[in-house]
UniProtKB/Swiss-Prot annotation:
CDD domains: F1-ATPase_gamma. Keywords: ATP synthesis, Cell membrane, CF(1), Hydrogen ion transport, Ion transport, Membrane, Transport. Belongs to the ATPase gamma chain family. F-type ATPases have 2 components, CF(1) - the catalytic core - and CF(0) - the membrane proton channel. CF(1) has five subunits: alpha(3), beta(3), gamma(1), delta(1), epsilon(1). CF(0) has three main subunits: a, b and c. One of its GO terms (cellular component) is proton-transporting ATP synthase complex. This is ATP synthase gamma chain. GO terms for molecular function: ATP binding; proton-transporting ATP synthase activity, rotational mechanism. It comes from Wolbachia sp. subsp. Drosophila simulans (strain wRi).
């Protein structure tokens, strides 16, 4: 049996850990609310944008549509893997990397990978057979302007497809790894909310300049930026939720450990007192 001093020190250390996990849980809860608000605004915007593009494309023939969507066959993919810079969020980072590894079918294509998040890079840098791998840290601090600069600095025309792996937020306890293709543009997207998008109709828009090709090209380019930014917000919200749940679980575990240690401490203390009493009584009888 451990000594009272050892038990007391262990209880003190675990209480210190419990304070840390409680603070992290509260911070994650506050960040979760903030990221949910940003995600809600982003989802409304991208859903409306997707609906407008879908409606405008109804008036475009297939030849012009292929030109607008910049469909190419250059033999290469660009892949973004969105995760976190930090740990202590359960299997959040490892699950998205594992999902990406399982779902990324290259068909012999050259693949350039961009990891948005240090942890994803650390876990996945040796798992992908890719000659070009880039890491971007502080993924949660990336703003819309940063994404615009990032996408603007990439020649998307040299890629057949641009894919994004991210963690989609459903609720506090449910986040699922997802794969979204943001180039070429698709009428189906996991990033949009159909209840927010509105109906897709061909009743006709009035637009200036009266050049449907120019307008659609601009909107599709904007959509790539917004889609990547939305994936980052989905991932940040999922991360905050996963960390909050992980810290809540850690708090429960520390409570259980503290209860067991308190019981063990009391028993050890009681045994020590009993031993002392026996020694005192034995000493008195010898007199």
């Amino acid at each position: 049996m451990k000594s009272l001093k050892e038990l007391s020190l262990r209880i003190k250390n675990i209480r210190s850990v419990q304070k840390t996990t409680k603070i992290m849980q509260m911070v994650s809860a506050a960040k979760l609310l903030q990221s949910q608000k940003k995600l809600s605004n982003s989802k409304l915007y991208i859903s409306k944008l997707h609906s407008i593009i879908s409606s405008l494309m109804l008036s475009v023939d297939q030849e012009l549509l292929a030109k607008i969507l910049n469909v190419s066959n250059n033999g290469s993919y660009l892949v973004f893997i969105v995760a976190s810079d930090r740990g202590l969020c359960g299997n959040f980072n490892s699950s998205i990397v594992k999902f990406s590894q399982n779902k990324l079918i290259t068909n012999g294509k050259k693949v350039d990978i961009v990891f948005l998040g240090k942890k994803a890079f650390d876990i996945g840098k040796n798992r992908f057979d890719s000659k070009s791998i880039l890491k971007i840290e502080n993924s949660k601090g990336i703003t819309l302007k940063h994404v615009e600069a990032l996408v603007g600095g990439i020649d998307l025309s040299k890629y057949d497809k641009v894919k994004v792996f991210y963690s989609k937020f459903y609720n506090t306890f449910t986040q699922k790894p997802m794969l979204e293709t943001i180039k070429p543009w698709s009428k189906d997207s996991s990033l949009i909310d159909n209840s927010l998008a509105g109906p897709i109709t061909d009743y006709g828009y009035e637009y200036e300049p009266q050049n449907i090709e120019f307008i659609l090209k601009s909107l599709v380019q904007d959509y790539v930026v917004i889609a990547l930014y939305s994936a980052l917000l989905e991932s940040a919200t999922s991360e905050n939720s996963a960390r909050m749940v992980a810290m809540e679980s850690a708090n429960r575990n520390t409570k259980e450990i503290l209860n067991k240690l308190a019981l063990l401490y009391n028993r050890s203390r009681q045994a020590a007192i009993t031993t002392d009493l026996i020694e005192v009584i034995g000493g008195a009888e010898s007199l």
